[in-house]
Amino acid sequence: MAQTRKKVKLGRLELEVMEWVAIGLAFLGIVAVFCIFFIRRHVIEYHLDHTFGVNDPEFFGSALALYDPVPLTGNKIELLQDGDGYFPAMLAAIRGAKKTVNFQAYIVYSDKIGWAFRDALIERARAGVEVRVLLDGLGSGWNLNNSDVKMMEEVGCKFAYYHPILSWRVDRTNRRSHRRILVVDGRVGFTGGIGFAEQWSGHAQDANHWHDVQARVEGPLVSELQNAFEEHWIKTFGETLSGADQFPALGPAGEIRAQAITSHSFSMAPVPLTQAIAFAAAEKRIWITNAYCTPTDDQVDLLVRAVQRQVDVRFIVPGPHNDQPLTKSAGRAAYGRLLEGGVKIFEYQPTMIHTKAMVVDGMFSLFGSSNLDPRSSEINEELDLAIYDREFGTRMEAMFESDLKHSTEYTLQQFKNRSFWERVTEALMLPFRSQL
């Protein structure tokens, strides 16, 4: 006998409830989209003229003394290139820790590199060292196994994700911590833009091993790196850092004058302002290496005006090896104005170049986690070092020139001859460039 289905007739009350539930869900969806895509820092449109150079005292007062803390003298900053340079140095620092290790990263994978750092942190925690690990909920949350987190926590490591993805706080979902910080015993620090995964290992020997740079810091500047870590640790874990084990008295370790510039949620974006002042002050050279380069209209204007003052403006950006092709398409939309304005663009050929650095007139350097893009300017929480030192600037220029030897110039004619599909992709990606 065939079975007959019973028709369920909803009453008026049930229909009204369902309608209100649907309206409520739609409203929550709109709120979520607004929070994710439209909440960002206020960014000022800069209208700057060339009135002083980076060698003049006015530049130091305008660019470096805008923020708290002010620049500190007496620092030593080493540039460590590629995984063979920075990973052994960072692991050695962790393994030599006596009191405290504070480690913050955007990307940590469960792979050979991630496990090496996991094991080093676990070994120190077992030895009685206070170990704190703070990873971004997006950059690492999908890539680090829960078993690795559990292993660290079981031996006493304090662990937290910054802005976890699976959270009711949708207003935080799009605001990522892009900072990279390692501070050991409050005396030695590392920062830059690297990730802790196998593609950052090696010596950029092939397309599977990226080219990147990390800084090793000694001197009073280390306390600023510690402060930057503590800011996010308090927000995430609810614990302050104090005492001589975290903030020892730091004497001079070198002669470099520098400061750590951090961006915060809903505050003025300090890095774009510093970049803008440096662009306006340049008299000889602006050399920029940037992994994800989608400059704003204001930044393009300042760079083109610098060329008009006979400043040599050059970019090194990723070439055929790029892990974010859509970001590359969004960035290329700005190439036309840059190239027509006399800016030179070079594409790095051997592998993905992940460096985020600039040097102006061999005197002022900016180095760290920030890309030259709207996301770093308006959304992410970044950490960069602003360095006012000619000897360090000379090293930055030497690094740029070395990378330039492995790069090919991208010309205005190439830009004009790009394919129909390249143009379509650029047009489609441009509205989303702040999210890429």
Protein language model regions, located:
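Charged, low-complexity intrinsically disordered terminal segments
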Residues: 2-436
